[in-house]
Amino acid sequence: MSDRNPLIDADRRVDEDNTLRPQTLDDFVGQAAARANLKVFIEAAKVRGEALDHVLFVGPPGLGKTTLAQIMAKELGVNFRSTSGPVIAKAGDLAALLTNLEERDVLFIDEIHRLSPAVEEILYPAMEDFQLDLIIGEGPAARSVKIDLAKFTLVAATTRLGLLTTPLRDRFGIPTRLNFYTVEELEYIVRRGARIMQMGISPDGALEVARRSRGTPRIAGRLLRRVRDFALVAGADVIDRKIADEALSRLEVDNRGLDQLDRRYLNIIARNFGGGPVGIETIAAGLSEPRDAIEDIIEPYLIQQGFLQRTPRGRVLTAVAWQHLGLPAPAEIIQQSQYGLFMEDE
């Protein structure tokens, strides 16, 4: 049974978060380089009167890939259609989506790395030549049919760039990587969210929520809602640092944004395997969590925060992780950390 706190599980979608979504690129906070480039590409496409080139967003869950896709459609003044890789089970599903698109429409496919090979093959000519190549019938009576499509823009999102085949990856003219947000960016997002919810929040209260949001706007919005609930029940009109700290502590989110499952992950490596190296499959078995969830949701933030290193022999805790757990680090871990002897696994 999973111990992950759904309040800060960035892999889940909550409809109520839609009210906090920015509506334009100017409103969108963070990802400055990506936003600046997208503005140029969108404006150029509008000047040319053509469909925007296909866009691939890469990054951990909750950083704004879906929101950016929606904003792009609005900025282009076209329709927005959304689906995900697992939903498109067969070629006919994709054909139905593509044939219903109008000129320059934006089609968003989340988790595109989970498309089946058969569906992916259909997507190649659709992206490159705006044509569908379909086989009608079976056996000797089978025939190939070409269907012309409206010139559309495919915006795709993935958390696992390495799982995309090279032919598919190379067909995206605008690959864009999204990174974790800074505390300052998240603090602005929290203040904006509180304003939308008509809830007062002090600067130190906003900072406390931002610090514990794992660098992820979706989590910041979710935590803000729960902190607001605690504040309302306590009869407070303003969320200050004390209320935010008490609420987040009760939600088991520590001062570095780690939840119960993150700490179990670190403790398994520290207490059961002396800090590592240990393989991902062993960790997954110890946590009773799928490997994909660990690699997509837990590890990116731990690596980014300096708690974990991935080496050719497995996962290894850093001195920072040992300190956070309140445990003495082995001498070799301290030495290796000081001299940077670990090599990142590709």
Curated annotation (Swiss-Prot):
Pfam families per the UniProt record, alphabetical: AAA_lid_4 (PF17864), RuvB_C (PF05491), RuvB_N (PF05496)
Positions with a binding annotation for DNA: 291, 310, 315
Taxonomic classification: Bacteria, Pseudomonadati, Pseudomonadota, Alphaproteobacteria, Hyphomicrobiales
Compartment annotation: Cytoplasm
Region of interest (Large ATPase domain (RuvB-L)), residue spans: 1-181
Name of this protein: Holliday junction branch migration complex subunit RuvB
NCBIfam families: PRK00080.1, ruvB
Principal cellular location given in the protein's record: cytoplasm
Binding, Mg(2+): 66
Keywords: ATP-binding, Cytoplasm, DNA damage, DNA recombination, DNA repair, DNA-binding, Hydrolase, Nucleotide-binding
